[in-house]
Amino acid sequence: MSEQRGTIRRVFHWSWNQRHRFLQFGMVGVTGIALNQIVIWLCQEHLYTAIGDLSLRLNLAMATGILIGMTNNFHWNRKWTWKDRYRAEHTPLLKQYIQYCTANWAGILIQVALTNLLVLWMPYLVANLVGIGFASLANFTLNDLWTYRHVRTEGIDPEGAQLERARLALPLLLCGLVLSLCVYIVGLGSLHILSNGDELVYMQITRATAASGHWLPLASEDPAMVNTKPPLLFWQGILSTDWGTHWSLLALRWPSIVWTFATALMTGMLAWRLGGRDILRGVLAALFFLAFFSTFRYGRPFLTNPPETFWVFSCFSVMLWWSPGSFASRLAVPTVLGLLAGCALLTKSFAQLVPILAGLSLWHLSMRGWRWREFATRALPGLLWTSVLALGIFALWFAFDPKPAAIWRHFVVGENVGKMAGGIGSWFEGFLFSGDSVWTLALSWFLNAGLLAFPLFGVAVESWKHRREATREERLLWWWVLAIFLVFCIPAQRSGRYLLEAMPALAVLMALRWHHVGRNAFVLTHVGVLAVLVPIAWLSVTLAREIGIAWFSWWHWPFLAGAMAFAALSIAKPRWTAMCAAPAAMSVYLALTSFLAVFDAPGGAFDERTVAALKGKTLWVPENFRSVAELHRFLLPDTTIRGFASSLDAPPVKSTSVGEYYIVTEPLSSRAPEGAIGCRGQITSRHSPQQIWEMATGRISEHLFCREWIVPVSAPK
């Protein structure tokens, strides 16, 4: 505790030199403001007059002014304010400039958030001045502790290379792991968790199949979606809901987090074994995996990704756990791999066998010194047996389904072969230049890591630099990452979701190499945490002003403040920076869950009177994606739900009859439509570029929040 107080005192109890430095910092800031104003005037009145759009001209002028003003401030702070610091002269200029700009933008976010919060209780000009004051303090502190800090540190701990031996390391990580488990459980039954539109389709198929009373064939209200995936996921949903008798989001989703936690446990155990039975590395690997954005987004909903990731990574964990004996086995291990791979195929697709075989083949070749003849005689027969066994398990679907031709038509041809559709020319064009290009797929590694993208990039760079010193197991894990990437470059449709099976391997690599990565990578994670938490706080204040603070949980506001303080303290205290990166990322997920919980009951649900009025009735719900109306079955379980295109103002007249109802979406501030019998708060999705631009310029509540009103089909909108 005394050490923690000492850190806070060093940050905020400034000596005379620091006060003088802050005065210099302020004087430089004044010159930057003056230069910013001059540049904006010159651009607006003279340089950019050829731009007819006044709004675009002003924004370009402001961007130019900010860039030049920030560059001016960076130069003089480097040459004058912090000229006594070693880093001011010996750090690469571009690297230091990026750090300075990042610190400035963090200050801007703090100013905007504080101004929007304080304007509830004081005049906006006074609130803005207070926001500027706190932002200046934050900006100065970040630059003093990070951009121009006293010591240059290449490792995590500036006081020593063995940070993992710090007394608080393991307790902090264990607390972070407990926090992660809680984050995954909280809000699991919410309508508004981060998910994917496929979840609604899978729910609809599960419900229809359960209603049919048969395991096979699969059923759906949309004939084109009947066999979109193998049956294992839908059988899981049937069992967890007891054939639909306990139909709820929580009942459908809880098996997903069981799969995700099992994968995290397997990841931690593997890192523990490969790291010399070091429990710190094991806990860290599990924590990294759970803190990846892709794990949080796809590891909780009712999707194929949680079980698929478990089964696929199990194949490679088995090989590493019993290495090198597993590579010499010709029957036992290939049989186990065939069973595991078969479960993966029956969860997602027979095509999943390709990356599994590619990864295992590269592993066998690497272990045999790339001797192809030895690979063909000793490893290939086992791989062929694994393939036959896995495909045999997948073929059970065809064997037991009474309509195998429909499976071939919808799943094999439509769902899988269709992704390779198109000629060679169009494939190459998409490979290099489309939104699904190979470059986008490569970037997906870091998008999947989310706020841990910076440490992941650092691990990749360090691993490449020291590739000759890498252990055999590290090389194998990198071969698996490369294999799955190369395989999924082939389909015309490329998505970061296809790479999820390799994210546990990256978590293990990060746990093994984290102490080789510079502290700056983890500092950037904490800056990113602040950059996300501040907008969440801003949106929370904006929504509270519209609908009232009572809609929020009592712990929402103190948790936001605590999470931001935790990230700032982790930056200020070098020994905490790396260890607290994953828990800080998890705090962002919990803050987002708390914010989205506003749109659950009671604010995001229809009241009891509305639910009773719609019992036995038909409600038409606008859909901008397939099966979106499925969510309203959880809100109105005794109502017949039907969907219509969201591009229409109302359901088609020919499809409706008197006594039916439909949903009208209006802004929060709009009055109730005539004849409305109830409403609920909602958050919108799938915004146009124009709407995104308008939200970025301040019109948030108009486009991000809305109300769903239920009106009779005979009532005018």
What are these model-predicted stretches?
Residues F12-W14, I156-Y184, W272, M367-G369, ...:
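Start-transfer (signal-anchor) and selected internal transmembrane alpha helices
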Residues V126, G176, T267-A291:
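Transmembrane-helix signature of polytopic, membrane-embedded enzymes
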Residues V183-G187, V201-M225, L232, L239, ...:
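Extracytosolic helix-loop segments that constitute the early lumenal/periplasmic catalytic or substrate-binding loops
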Residues Y202-A208, L339-C343, T347, Q352-T471, ...:
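Transmembrane-lumen/periplasm boundary regions of multi-pass, lipid-linked membrane glycan transferases
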Residues L249-R253, R297-E308, S349, S495:
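Short acidic/glycine- and proline-prone juxtamembrane loop motifs at membrane-interface regions
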Residues W254-G276, S314:
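Transmembrane-helix motifs of polytopic, lipid-linked glycan transferases
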Residues W272-G276, C315-P334, A344, W514-G518:
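Membrane-interface transmembrane helices that cradle and orient dolichyl/undecaprenyl
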Residues L331, T335, E462-F644, L668-R671, ...:
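Membrane-embedded architecture of ER/inner-membrane glycosylation machinery
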